[in-house]
């Protein structure tokens, strides 16, 4: 296979880390500014310092990508984002990473010349969502870390999109963009750049009978990924950018990791896959810089497994600590204290009766940049003329500049004398002009002034008109809902059947439910599609495509864009509803889906009542009861404990406060869903909920058994308080 150019993409959580990455050989860096980035606690530069960072990177031909990879509320998007990005755009920012669909649409409108990269926070798992993003103007997709080499190759072959994947650093246990763990437990949302990493804490695995299966272990803490050995395979799968994680790490870490990946990328680009081999010394150096119980190769070659988890994480020995300190000292001296230099070619010309002339040129990022400056007219020497060595001595002084001489030619005529100050001034002026030219070639003209957004009036549902939607994940819950419809005719508007639970019997079940609905209030039947929709899931659905096409359901509830594309490609003309994790944090993202014919959209779970009131309208669905899905994971707790039976069941994770989080394993697609220890309960706030203006309210049944669903449905009717443990979620507090 033809070798393509590869990009070594480095993290920079500070200006110092940026310099370290550049010195160590990064092709590009990604960093956050003072707002809207997924690492709010890094030492992110702001204002003029951020602009200096862009210029610094460009001086060396290194690209800088700015992270705006969080979900934005309406006020932030409409009143802050344009002014935040405008100076960066003018300074030649190379790209912006985004998570929010509304942000994507706004940037494409305001800054059409600014490339947009889709963040891994978008949970991009297949070619459908990549094509969708390409239609919206995205130039690069950062794929979910969980994808295999086969899946990556499939995406590249079908889309041709520029792809970026993680090759080194920390792995989240949850699919990026789908985690609410930190948000719900402490109000620090990963979707807002403030994750507190509860996944790194210890938990006990508890079975369905509440028997502890383990002591306290870090069951949700993956080892860091090190895919150094897989660079040829990753490149040949179609990946262009090799991303290193670590914006919270020190500059020496950045330098050390970038240096090694630079070495092996260059080796591969020069020699190909044949003979590609990683030296053990380099592998050990990476381990020394940082590891959690060793490394794994991530998900490139396996779906999940115990060997990917950091269950032990033993403390470093004294010898390892000394070796680490020595390595950090060495890296600091070589890459942090010592900045990279740009090789310069120069020609100095001094002849009688003409101004001195200095021409400087350098090649950066494959382009030649050249400047020419003039100085004073040389004097005729009265006594001893200046020798060539004296001119060279002054012109070669480059201390305090980012340049080093590659070549300097002198053209001298006659017997000349030039004051040292004049030579120094000429040299200084020339180097400043070259530096300015190198930086300003990236600068852009001012964008067009931001035009006021056309006001879109969305009709709100009147209090008391809210429809009841209910989702079920077990047959027992389904029966309880059916019993409710018989006794409370006309109360239910829509029933969602979880696809994986009922997949084998949908063909028979849906017609039965439609008949039941016609007898008890004409409610609708929707199929709730899987939380993730990857290549193996898609193939299974394609094998049953005729069944999905002919299924007499009223529509589908999608939990990711991949499912939307699958349904549309299959010719589906039925209703499509958005679940809460296809985020519509702002009106722009909501309108984007509406224009695609997706009217009913579930409100995000991280907005408070005031914010919900601003975005809710007659086609909004407000969740009023249910356990929040805290994590959707490719990892499986059963497999981690070597207890995989390929049989769905419910376990629990018990934390240090003895709270128990239900864990469901979905075996058809091999993923886990971890739920909150307490359900959201807003049934006694019915009057307040109705003032939001949403057209429907949804009750999510997940772990409820026996009479619980039936009793809870009655509480929706009566609006009565509940004596059990519950949470108000973010209804009052929201997220920062």
What feature does the model see in each segment?
Residues 1-24, 28-39, 54, 60-68, ...:
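Surface-exposed amphipathic alpha-helical tracts and adjacent flexible/coil segments at the periphery
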Residues 43-44:
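Conserved non-cysteine loop/helix-boundary elements of the Radical SAM core domain that shape
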Residues 105:
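A cross-family signal for key residues in well-ordered alpha-helices
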Residues 122-126:
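Conserved phosphate-binding/catalytic loop of the ribokinase/pfkB sugar-kinase fold
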């Amino acid at each position: 296979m033809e070798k393509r150019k590869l990009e070594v993409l480095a993290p920079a959580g500070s200006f110092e880390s940026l310099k370290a990455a550049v010195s160590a050989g990064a092709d590009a860096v990604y960093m956050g500014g003072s707002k809207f980035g997924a690492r709010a606690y890094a030492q992110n530069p702001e204002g003029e310092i951020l602009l200096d960072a862009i210029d610094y990177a460009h001086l060396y031909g290194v690209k800088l990508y700015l992270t705006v990879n969080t979900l934005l509320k309406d006020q932030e998007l409409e009143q802050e984002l344009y002014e935040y990005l405008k100076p960066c755009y003018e300074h030649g920012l190379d790209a912006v990473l985004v998570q929010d669909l509304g942000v994507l649409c706004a940037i494409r409108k305001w800054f059409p010349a600014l490339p947009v990269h889709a963040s891994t926070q978008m949970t991009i798992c297949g070619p459908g969502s990549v094509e969708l993003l390409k239609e919206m103007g995205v130039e690069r997709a950062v794929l979910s870390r969980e994808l295999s080499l086969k899946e990556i190759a499939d995406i590249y072959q079908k889309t041709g999109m520029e792809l970026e994947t993680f090759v080194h650093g920390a792995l989240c246990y949850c699919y990026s963009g789908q985690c609410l763990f930190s948000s719900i437990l402490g109000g620090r949302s990963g979707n807002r750049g403030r994750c507190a990493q509860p996944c790194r804490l210890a938990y006990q695995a508890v079975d369905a009978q509440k028997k502890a299966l383990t002591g306290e272990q870090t069951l949700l803490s993956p080892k860091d990924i090190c895919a150094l050995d897989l660079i040829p395979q990753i490149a040949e799968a179609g990946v262009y950018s090799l991303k290193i994680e670590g914006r919270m790490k020190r500059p020496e870490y950045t330098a050390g990791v970038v240096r090694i990946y630079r070495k092996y990328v260059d080796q591969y680009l020069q020699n190909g896959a044949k003979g590609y081999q990683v030296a053990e010394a380099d592998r050990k150096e990476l381990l020394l810089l940082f590891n959690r119980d060793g490394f794994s190769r991530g998900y490139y070659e396996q779906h999940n497994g115990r060997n990917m988890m950091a269950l032990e994480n033993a403390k470093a020995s004294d010898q390892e600590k000394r070796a680490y300190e020595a390595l950090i000292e060495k890296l600091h001296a070589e890459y942090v204290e010592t900045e990279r230099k740009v090789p310069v070619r120069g020609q100095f010309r001094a002849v009688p009766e003409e101004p001195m002339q200095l021409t400087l040129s350098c090649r950066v990022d494959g382009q030649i940049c050249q400047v020419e400056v003039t100085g004073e007219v040389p004097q005729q020497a009265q006594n001893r003329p200046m020798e060539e060595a004296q001119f060279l001595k002054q012109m070669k002084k480059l201390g305090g500049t980012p340049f080093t001489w590659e070549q300097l030619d002198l053209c001298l005529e006659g017997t000349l004398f030039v004051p040292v100050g004049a030579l120094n001034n000429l040299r200084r002026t020339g180097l400043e002009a070259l530096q300015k030219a190198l930086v300003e070639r990236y600068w852009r003209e001012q964008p067009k002034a931001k035009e006021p957004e056309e006001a879109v009036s969305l009709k709100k549902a009147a209090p008391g008109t809210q429809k009841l939607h209910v989702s079920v994940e077990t047959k027992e819950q389904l029966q309880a809902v059916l019993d409710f419809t018989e006794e409370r005719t006309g109360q239910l508007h829509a029933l969602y059947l979880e696809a994986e639970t009922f997949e084998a019997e949908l063909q028979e079940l849906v017609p039965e439910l439609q008949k039941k609905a016609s007898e008890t209030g004409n409610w609708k039947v929707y199929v709730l599609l899987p939380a993730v929709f990857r290549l193996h899931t898609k193939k299974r659905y394609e094998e049953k495509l005729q069944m999905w096409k002919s299924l007499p359901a009223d529509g589908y509830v999608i939990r990711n864009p991949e499912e939307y594309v699958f349904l549309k490609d299959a010719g589906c003309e039925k209703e499509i509803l958005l679940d809460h994790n296809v985020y519509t944090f702002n009106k722009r993202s909501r309108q984007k889906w509406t224009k695609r014919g997706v009217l009913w959209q579930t409100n995000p779970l991280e907005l408070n009542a005031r914010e919900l009131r601003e975005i809710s309208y007659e086609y909004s669905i407000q969740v009023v009861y249910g356990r929040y899905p805290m994590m959707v994971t490719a990892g499986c707790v059963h497999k981690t404990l070597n207890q995989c039976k390929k049989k769905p069941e419910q376990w629990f994770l018990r934390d240090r406060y003895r709270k128990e989080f239900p864990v469901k394993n979905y075996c058809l697609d091999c993923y886990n869903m971890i739920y909150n220890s307490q359900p959201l309960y807003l049934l006694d706030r019915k009057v307040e909920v109705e003032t939001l203006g949403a057209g429907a309210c949804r009750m999510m049944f997940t772990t409820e058994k026996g009479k619980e669903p039936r009793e809870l449905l009655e509480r929706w009717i009566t609006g009565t308080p509940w004596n059990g443990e519950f949470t108000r979620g973010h209804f009052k507090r929201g997220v920062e």
